[in-house]
Amino acid sequence: MTLDKGQKFSAKHGPNAQADPIIKDKVNKHAAQGKLPCAVAFKIADELEVSPAEIGKTADLLDLRLSKCQLGLFGYQPAKKAVKARAPENRQLEDAIRKALNDGKLACSDAWDIAGRFKVPKMAVSGACESLNIKIKPCQLGAF
């Protein structure tokens, strides 16, 4: 769901959505300047044994902006995006990306899995997707 200009992130979840108090407290402790970095969100999810989506939802309900996507897709300054298009390192990597596509898109979780399987940085996978004109969606945190 995209937001209209000036709309708060919490609007994505409806007026009755509530944040879990334990998650809310942990997210608030780690947020700085209205932002929560992707890596920190995943660390919190791991510590609390909840899904990354729960952390993303809580960040939304607190109207925090997610930053520094580990795939380099959003949250960087000044360009917003850190990833650069880069040809896949090998044919097997490209094949794995193409095999994991769903409706022409690669899920963020699949990008992470592929990076782990091939022992390459996450941005190597997202860079390959950029060069292949493949969108990465959905985000595990719910950013897109």
Predicted regions and their residues:
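Long, charge-rich, low-complexity intrinsically disordered regions
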Residues: M1-F144
